[in-house]
Amino acid sequence: MGQTKSKIKSKYASYLSFIKILLKRGGVKVSTKNLIKLFQIIEQFCPWFPEQGTLDLKDWKRIGKELKQAGRKGNIIPLTVWNDWAIIKAALEPFQTEEDSISVSDAPGSGIIDCNEKTRKKSQKETESLHCEYVAEPVMAQSTQNVDYNQLQEVIYPETLKLEGKGPELVGPSESKPRGTSPLPAGQVPVTLQPQKQVKENKTQPPVAYQYWPPAELQYRPPPESQYGYPGMPPAPQGRAPYPQPPTRRLNPTAPPSRQGSELHEIIDKSRKEGDTEAWQFPVTLEPMPPGEGAQEGEPPTVEARYKSFSIKILKDMKEGVKQYGPNSPYMRTLLDSIAHGHRLIPYDWEILAKSSLSPSQFLQFKTWWIDGVQEQVRRNRAANPPVNIDADQLLGIGQNWSTISQQALMQNEAIEQVRAICLRAWEKIQDPGSTCPSFNTVRQGSKEPYPDFVARLQDVAQKSIADEKARKVIVELMAYENANPECQSAIKPLKGKVPAGSDVISEYVKACDGIGGAMHKAMLMAQAITGVVLGGQVRTFGGKCYNCGQIGHLKKNCPVLNKQNITIQATTTGREPPDLCPRCKKGKHWASQCRSKFDKNGQPLSGNEQRGQPQAPQQTGAFPIQPFVPQGFQGQQPPLSQVFQGISQLPQYNNCPPPQVAVQQ
């Protein structure tokens, strides 16, 4: 069955030793014989399993599914194989993160190692220790690449190798020496640290914490009253903090340094104690310098750029609002507008807001329209007189001069306002999944749709499809009349082109259409139809419209203009005018051959021809016409009734079949 034990052992030598050490660290001992048996079964039913092994939990779950399918088909799977498979799968679960791949280039000050502590509350345990375990991120993401498990063992379990005189130096509770950043050896797998929880078996023994300290320029000394750390974890060394200091830069470099405010530190301390470690964004705020620390006398006061963290409640509201109502719902637009105008958001903050609340496809749309808006704004800045010195890198927060938060904090107010307008505009163009943006020309008012609802839909579509504000306003005013229903058009028509300067055209249209479709409006229409009065400066006529002259009050056949034309044509063709009234209808001066009237002057219907012939008697239809029976001798006179019945009795009687012939015996 499968390959031999020696081949399996030589093929997976390094992987088997790594699995044994991994299980041993978890408190489970598995014999090499059982592991070889497991890999024999895997070789037989899972030929896709890589030769160098895998640490991806998804692959081991797939192995379990395929082994179950093999068991259902009648193959015998030993019980020890199931036990070993379950143990290995459970041992690999701590290596899986919420996102299977974490970029190691985002670590501040180091591209190799980043340790980020997290904690969670448990009802059964009052205190827990925090232990940072190394996670081989590229191995989990790409389990088929060549991996040296001996080097990986040195990275994952340094404290075991420390006892043997190898591995990196540990930073204990009483040591304050930070860990340096050395280049990776050739062939070593880059790793990133992911926080994992472990409940202490022996509470009397203090845990060992492996911490990464950021560079000195990103650190600050906490205030004396602040206490960092979690229950069951030793405090951080003096002068070090387990998270970097938000950069603080002055807009006036010549001003002397001011006292470092404690408000920012208090916010960070509070969020850290509450477990809010995922929302440390810092919108820029400009605060006036204290007296004596700003500019000299006679100079304008200086301000200092500081960061204040976003509340986690804002990010949660943004995420829930987008999920429940959509990114362009009235609630989300109002919330985003209040955040945008209530904070001095830099490009980094806009990217954080979009990433935390939008789906990947929606964020891609936002980023695309952001870049498109930046290109348009840069063209306007260059065409201005004088040109505005704001480039695309500054509006996007990229490049050598604007890629960091501290550099973006120094952006001028004009650049901040341009970024705000561009990002709000890009957010409005985000479409919900499965929806398409219709053309503004196809937005029409329904027969029973209120006029304000129609205008709101029209403005929303125009805002997404037309970038120029002036052009959008003209299109909305035009379509608000052209695409309205007939009732609203008749109400708006007296106002078209006559709205006073300074007044909003759409507002005047909405006022004119107020109440259309209601009971009061229907009653007014009925009253106007009966009395023909003029109400509200609007003439309501319900007569027919002439298709010849376009006037109201008569039809084309009664149009006086058409009759005059006919008379002129007749006089031209015949050379003479009709002498008198039509002899056929007696109500018009025209020739009888041209009379098209169906009724005369008295209202009597007229036939198609002037004279009709004698009506013909109805003809009898049938095979045998009925002839009256008259007995002989009474021709020309009425015979007696007895003679009539006697004659009828002498008529031959026929049935459907002839009478039967009865033979008479002699």
UniProtKB/Swiss-Prot annotation:
Myristoylation is essential for retroviral assembly. Alteration of the glycine residue leads to a block in the budding of particles and an accumulation of Gag inside the cell. Pfam families: Gag_p10, Gag_p24, Gag_p24_C, zf-CCHC, zf-CCHC_5. Residues 165-264, 598-641 are annotated as: Disordered. PROSITE patterns: ZF_CCHC. Gene3D superfamilies: 1.10.1200.30, Human Immunodeficiency Virus Type 1 Capsid Protein (1.10.375.10), Retroviral GAG p10 protein (1.10.150.490), Zinc finger, CCHC-type (4.10.60.10). A zinc finger (CCHC-type) spans 544-561, 580-597. It is a lipid-anchor. One of its GO terms (cellular component) is plasma membrane. The keyword Zinc applies. One of its GO terms (biological process) is viral translational frameshifting. It is found in: Cell membrane. The keyword Repeat applies. Residues 232-247 have a biased composition (Pro residues). Keywords: Cell membrane, ERV, Lipoprotein, Membrane, Metal-binding, Myristate, Repeat, Transposable element, Zinc, Zinc-finger. Residues 604-622 have a biased composition (Polar residues). A lipid is attached at G2 (N-myristoyl glycine). Residues 624-640 have a biased composition (Low complexity). Its main location: membrane. HERV-K Gag polyprotein contains regions homologous to the matrix (MA), capsid (CA) and nucleocapsid (NC) proteins from infectious retroviruses. Evidence suggests that HERV-K(HML-2) Gag polyprotein can be cleaved into mature MA, CA and NC under certain circumstances. However, the exact boundaries as well as the size of processed Gag proteins have not been precisely determined yet. This Gag protein is encoded by a human specific provirus. The products of the Gag polyproteins of infectious retroviruses perform highly complex orchestrated tasks during the assembly, budding, maturation, and infection stages of the viral replication cycle. During viral assembly, the proteins form membrane associations and self-associations that ultimately result in budding of an immature virion from the infected cell. Gag precursors also function during viral assembly to selectively bind and package two plus strands of genomic RNA. Endogenous Gag proteins may have kept, lost or modified their original function during evolution. Belongs to the beta type-B retroviral Gag protein family. HERV class-II K(HML-2) gag subfamily. This is Endogenous retrovirus group K member 9 Gag polyprotein. It comes from Homo sapiens.
